[in-house]
Amino acid sequence: MSTFTRLIAATSSTFPRQCLTGGVLFATGDTIAQQLVEKRGSRHDLARTFRLSLYGGCVFSPLASIWFGRVLERVRFSSKAANIATKVALDQAIASPAFVALFFGATTIMEGGSPDQAKNKIIHNWWPTLKTAWGLWIPVQTLNMALVPPSQRLLFVNVVSIFWNTFLSIKSAAASDHAVKPNLNDAVELVETKLDKLH
């Protein structure tokens, strides 16, 4: 096990640590987006990274911890296949749509936007982002429910979320940062196209 994986595993066993891990991983995703995709270099938007870290630690992780640890674990069938199929279906029919909307709404408000601006951002970005989410998370969550012990499922999601958080950061910036919007749209379209081919 790599040092990075051991670090995440060590910080994913309790609720406060899960929140800390979520904050770190959202910050990591945004840093990758800004430095490797947007090529910002010294123009790195620290406030944006802080906002996403705050969202990951204080909004997403607490809700995800409850969802995986308390809600989905109540689903029990005698058949393992039925268990997996039901949990993945519930996760993608309920949690994914809600979390996508929550991300765009919460981050817009955290940027200083109005409720109307948050609503508009959700309307324009929710469905394209949700389709991309399904392309990634349906296979990921199937593996998660089938192979990963319940206590480590949020850890597994967090590791994959580094890449997903990078995409969300780019997608959010493309909808609000006009200075770099053309390049960001190219990156968003590339990811969406690749994941659409998995359907």
UniProtKB/Swiss-Prot annotation:
Membrane is among the record's keywords: yes
Keyword Phosphoprotein tagged: no
Compartments, as annotated in UniProt: Mitochondrion inner membrane
GO biological process terms, semicolon-separated: ethanol metabolic process
Entry keyword set: Membrane, Mitochondrion, Mitochondrion inner membrane, Transmembrane, Transmembrane helix
Transmembrane segments: 52-72, 93-113, 130-150, 154-174
Function (record text): May be involved in cellular response to stress. Required to maintain mitochondrial DNA (mtDNA) integrity and stability.
Name of the protein in question: Protein SYM1
Source lineage: Eukaryota, Fungi, Dikarya, Basidiomycota, Ustilaginomycotina
